Amino acid sequence: MDSLLHYVHASFSSLLTPFSFSLSQGPANYSQWARFSPLPVVVNKDLSEHIKTEDDSRYFSLIDVFDDNAGTLNEQLAKELLAKDFERNIGIDVSFHQNSGAAIYQQLGIAIAKTKELTELFGKEILNQLVFRIAIGANYFFEMSKVRALKLTFNQLSKEFGLDEIPYIFAETSLRNKAKNDEENNLIRSTLELAAAMIGGADAVFTNDYKLQNANELSEEISFKQQIVLAYES
């Protein structure tokens, strides 16, 4: 996800799962997708400084304030993001860990540990300002359960602070099980991963391009339309 903004489009299918496609530039009017309402997602901390929110715009930040390599929290960045007029201000990224080979229980543990540390630092009010970014692997039923388990564990944590919050989950297809020389297989795997995320109850889904090298407009369009096909098939 190298682009600065992603647009998430809400689908009123039976799964009620928004989905997204990648933009390399700023906001645009995609009238052909009239059935879907645009929901901008910020993934670049430098861009966030220049965004002017409007009454009809809802920005969701996927920017993680934790340095997973150093194991530290960037408190100043967190304060700057919380000062923004976003719908949700801070991302908790555990897709990095899935793509690095972490087990499901490790991914969930890291997500909850990050949440607890943020809550202790900024108070319980931060719980409804978080976006969980997760990657969905090939183990269909286990990945479906991972999404639901994250909802349950987060909700249980919020109850410890006297709240009853449900997490906002942004799920994307995994990169770990994709191959440069097997594009068709990548397409099949990512479709199953999307289905697992949607059935599991993710609030938004994103498809990484199935062509790991020499990606083009056609491959981007096909990757995006995977999500549309699943929404209508449901």
PLM feature spans:
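Accessory "access/gating" subregions that flank catalytic or transport cores
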Residues: 116, 120, 135-136, 151, ...
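Catalytic alpha/beta active-site cores
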Residues: 1-140, 166, 204, 208, ...
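Alpha-helical transition-metal enzyme core signature, strongest for iron centers
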Residues: 147-151, 195-198
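Short glycine/threonine-rich loop-to-helix capping motif typified by GTGT followed
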Residues: 106-107, 138-149, 176-188, 215-223
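Inter-helical turn/loop segments and adjacent helix faces that build the functional surface
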Residues: 129, 158-161, 213, 234
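Active-site or pore-adjacent capping/gating segments
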Residues: 192, 203-234
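A glycine-rich, aromatic-flanked flexible loop/lid motif
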Residues: 123-126, 163-167, 194-204, 229-233
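Conserved, mostly hydrophobic/aromatic
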Residues: 154, 200, 226
